Amino acid sequence: MTTATAIVAGHGLALRRSLPLPNPPGRATTSVSLSARPVTPARRMIVPASPSPRSPRRCRSISSESSTEASAAADIADEEVEAENKVDPQAEVCYLDPDVDPESIREWELDFCSRPILDARGKKVWELVVCDATLSLQFTRYFPNNAINSVTLRDALASVSEALGVPMPDRVRFFRSQMQTIITRACGDLGVKAVPSRRCVSLLLWLEERYEVVYSRHPGFQAGTRPLLALDNPFPTTLPENLFGDKWAFVQLPFSAVREEVESLERRYAFGAGLDLELLGFELDDTTLVPGVAVESSRAKPLAAWMNGLEICAMEADTGRASLILSAGVSTRYVYSGYQKTAASTQEAEAWEAAKKACGGLHFLAIQENLNSDGCVGFWLLLDLPPPPV
């Protein structure tokens, strides 16, 4: 068995194991290349310190910091708590960053759902929350539960554009599958493409923040209320044939290199998606190893093109089923690959998941023509997130 090293855009990736992807009917079986030097968690993982406080527009922070930095962060936290205490939970938000060109905001993220709040009639209050990926645009509006339909949503979305002086977006992402009909119809009336996707990272984290700062302080707040429209987590299905690669590997990339990949994504890759690491508060040490999955394919460009339309949001090593699970859209889960369940493969999968947790859920997917090649055809930065509390 040979030793392989996967490379992403000139950065050496610590390859744990190269495994064949399952083959569709009639396709030849590919070879298996196992690393002769499996990486153990103790040698390879750098665990970040406790999360530091959020800045006013930052949803959360994952960092490694000194005691001096921690002290300064604590002072900032005190100031932010004081500011949060002044928030009126019944006020609505209508904000556009004055330093941002309104024409540059071409994609929105939205949620339209009930909140754990009762109005004067004793009925649940609904809320529209709209933002962009950088939180340069922020808009909220409350609605009574008897006014929930596509016309209400259409008019509210149009009012976002009018109130903030921004054009209607090209695309709107949303993460609740139960609202797909209403959202798609409302967006369609406005000539906007509605995209079901859990890549609404800024929105999801903003909702978590609003639960703590706004909803829980509202006079009508109902503690312990379960979300009316919970997120789906369906059983994974068979991977479509056009998404098959040849083999894959658990890999790791230093955080400094991940930043470089994200910063150069538009310049170097036709396919892929990044995340705003600064906004999300990822301030890990440059040497912190971020886990990922590298996929080799002899038809890497077509594969990356197909993957690019999936709204990929996460990958998971399911050690119980000895499978690699790909999550996409809002409620789509595929068995991307199975692998032989052994003590060694289970340990590698567990170490990979532990590395994700240590990095605050950050991980990536890279598609290459060859695991030994210098460069990627596609690169997606992914993030594990818990479901929002509302």
Swiss-Prot record:
GO terms for molecular function: phosphatidylinositol-4,5-bisphosphate phospholipase C activity; RNA binding. Signal peptide: none annotated. Keywords: Chloroplast, Plastid, Transit peptide. Pfam families: Tab2-like_C, Tab2-like_N. One of its GO terms (biological process) is photosystem I assembly. Residues 1-69 form a transit peptide. GO terms for cellular component: chloroplast. Disruption phenotype: Pale green leaf phenotype. Residues 61-75 have a biased composition (Low complexity). InterPro entries: PLipase_C_Pinositol-sp_Y, Tab2-like, Tab2-like_C, Tab2-like_N. Residues 16-85 are annotated as: Disordered. It is found in: Plastid, Chloroplast. Nuclear genome-encoded factor involved in the biogenesis of photosystem I (PSI). Required for the accumulation of PSI during plant development. Does not seem to be required for the translation of mRNAs of the PSI subunits. This is Protein TAB2 homolog, chloroplastic. The gene is TAB2.
